[in-house]
């Protein structure tokens, strides 16, 4: 077996839709085609939105499709726990490393203040934090804490972080200009995705991260966190987003085709074959198992632009 360790890192807030399934398929194929393995980590930081029964369903769905993980989830393994809701003490340890470096500060900004019309925005519409609370005095912090419980941000340097994505190619961002100081912890104490994912991937031995292109812009700040925390960074492969026939992003909230509905009409092989077809891995939407696709898998066959699902394919 090769040293490649891929992973699934789903948030179990509902049944998986086609976009989630496509990401899992590519993650599995990318790892298995080089003789590697796949770890399943359940990203249930928000335990209210992500009940355990959804996590169990998700794991069963992956097995039904032939995409079962080698480690993690209910199967367990040597680097657990594999549920983020059970890893708070681990996140606390690494959070405190950043606190000791003097990089963490309280933020009292409300949602309306952050999204005000005059707030800095990226070209994709995301808000870049203006640093409003970065230089508050100790006295100001004490006063504001009596009025509002703060969230906690990390100070980023005026530095450009660049890397070569395994699928999308070169990418770079200036942390101060394009990202801004970002959240590490919510006001209710829950740790933020950016910190948790970095700590988890490093401690679970993940060497290859496959995820949607919507997370490409998160990578520079995560690479910076890996460096600040002294953790090894994986390789990244960002896949194109799967869009509905009308150009919308697929969403659990919008009721887009979930696996629950697909299972009533298709076999696992039919679903996998159709996903492989839209990803460029085969020329016709014939039924296939993941194992049948692994031998000939190549990222060069996967498009870089977003994929619009053909009408009537599912």
Language-model-derived ranges and their functions:
Residues 60, 93, 116, 131, ...:
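Charged/polar, solvent-exposed surface patches and flexible loops
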Residues 112-251, 258-262, 311-314:
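Active-site cores that bind ATP or allylic diphosphates and position pyrophosphate for catalysis
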Residues 55, 88, 111-114, 126, ...:
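Alpha-helix initiation and N-capping motif
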Residues 1-122, 213-214, 218-231, 288:
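N-terminal Rossmann-like or analogous alpha/beta NTP/dinucleotide-binding catalytic cores
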Residues 46-56, 244-246, 295-303:
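Short, mixed-charge aromatic SLiMs
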Residues 82-97, 121-128, 148-158, 278-293:
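Short secondary-structure transition/capping segments
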Residues 1-15, 33, 38, 65, ...:
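Non-catalytic terminal extensions that flank enzyme cores
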Residues 17, 81-89, 146-148, 194-199, ...:
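Noncatalytic linker/hinge segments flanking ATPase motor cores
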């Amino acid at each position: 077996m090769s040293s490649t360790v891929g992973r699934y890192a789903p948030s179990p807030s509902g049944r998986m839709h086609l976009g989630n399934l496509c990401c899992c398929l590519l993650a599995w194929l990318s790892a298995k085609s080089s003789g590697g393995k796949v770890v399943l980590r359940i990203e249930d930081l928000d335990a209210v939105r992500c009940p355990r029964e959804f996590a169990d369903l998700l794991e069963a769905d992956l097995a039904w499709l032939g995409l079962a993980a080698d480690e993690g989830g209910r199967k367990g393994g040597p680097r657990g726990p594999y549920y983020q809701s059970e890893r708070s003490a681990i996140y606390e340890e690494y959070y405190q490393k950043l606190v000791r470096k003097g990089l963490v500060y309280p933020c009292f900004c409300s949602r309306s203040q952050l999204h005000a019309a005059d707030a800095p925005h990226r070209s994709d519409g995301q808000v870049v934090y203006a640093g409003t609370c970065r230089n508050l005095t100790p006295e100001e912090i004490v006063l504001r804490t009596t009025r509002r419980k703060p969230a906690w941000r990390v100070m980023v340097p005026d530095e450009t972080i660049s890397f070569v994505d395994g699928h999308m190619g070169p990418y770079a961002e200036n942390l101060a200009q394009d990202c801004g100081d970002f959240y590490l912890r919510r006001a209710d104490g829950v740790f933020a995705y950016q910190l948790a994912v970095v700590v988890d991937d490093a401690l679970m031995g993940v060497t290859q991260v496959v995820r949607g292109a919507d997370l490409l812009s998160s990578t520079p700040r995560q690479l910076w966190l890996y460096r600040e925390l002294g953790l090894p960074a994986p390789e990244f492969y960002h896949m194109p987003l799967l869009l509905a026939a009308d150009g919308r992003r697929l969403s659990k909230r919008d009721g887009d085709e979930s696996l629950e509905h697909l299972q009533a009409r298709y076999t696992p092989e039919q679903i996998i074959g159709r996903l492989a077809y839209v990803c460029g891995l085969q020329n016709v939407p014939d039924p296939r198992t993941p194992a049948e696709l692994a031998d000939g898998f190549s990222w060069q066959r996967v498009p870089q632009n977003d994929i619009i699902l053909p009408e009537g394919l599912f």
